Amino acid sequence: MKVNHAEIVISAVSKKQYPEDQLPEIALAGRSNVGKSSFINRLINRKNLARTSSKPGKTQTLNFYRINESFYFVDVPGYGYAKVSKKEREKWGRMMEEYFQTRDTLRAVVLVTDLRHDPTQDDIQMYDFIKYFDLPVIIIGTKLDKITKNKRQKHINRAKQVLEMDETDLFIPFSAEIGEGKDEAWSALSRYIKR
């Protein structure tokens, strides 16, 4: 997909702040600092629409990015960052649950994981959380370029096994650095962003 227009519209903390234009939405979930912002930036060929951070736990809101006036990427708070207080984690949990449960324009969730390592307990919990709400999920295994070619399939198989992925869910190996997996990601997303 060629992206001609991309902008951050709002950083929301509750549903009364969500955009009201009824465009389809794709949520992006993943551990803090796993590469969600880099994933967005690579897909849309922009260096810094989604701000990348060296500080984990920086995204504390639902960030709505309108793409081509036709759909939204919604970056949800990263999880698994130990220095965030329990109270703060609970607040994020409620915010995400409200979004996943009540948002009828939410079409699918992209779960971003680090392909170099086994999915964490938090990744498994998030995958199960998404499935609980009966939402389509696409797993993006980032940092593909950091794994030697002869070990990639082993890492992919292991990630699928640890997550106990449904066969109907897609797993796409991806590199924000070199763009590998970008076409496959757009192809997977395109079925959910048509109105």
From Swiss-Prot:
Its cofactor is Mg(2+). Keywords: Cell cycle, Cell division, GTP-binding, Magnesium, Metal-binding, Nucleotide-binding, Septation. It comes from the Bacteria. GO terms for biological process: division septum assembly. Pfam families: MMR_HSR1. GO terms for molecular function: GTP binding; metal ion binding. Residues 22-195 form the EngB-type G domain. InterPro entries: G_ENGB_dom, GTP-bd, GTP-bd_ribosome_bio_YsxC, P-loop_NTPase, Small_GTP-bd. GO terms for cellular component: cytosol. Mg(2+) binds at residues 37, 59. GTP binds at residues 30-37, 57-61, 75-78, 142-145, 174-176. PROSITE patterns: G_ENGB. HAMAP family: GTPase_EngB (MF_00321). Belongs to the TRAFAC class TrmE-Era-EngA-EngB-Septin-like GTPase superfamily. EngB GTPase family. Necessary for normal cell division and for the maintenance of normal septation. This is Probable GTP-binding protein EngB.
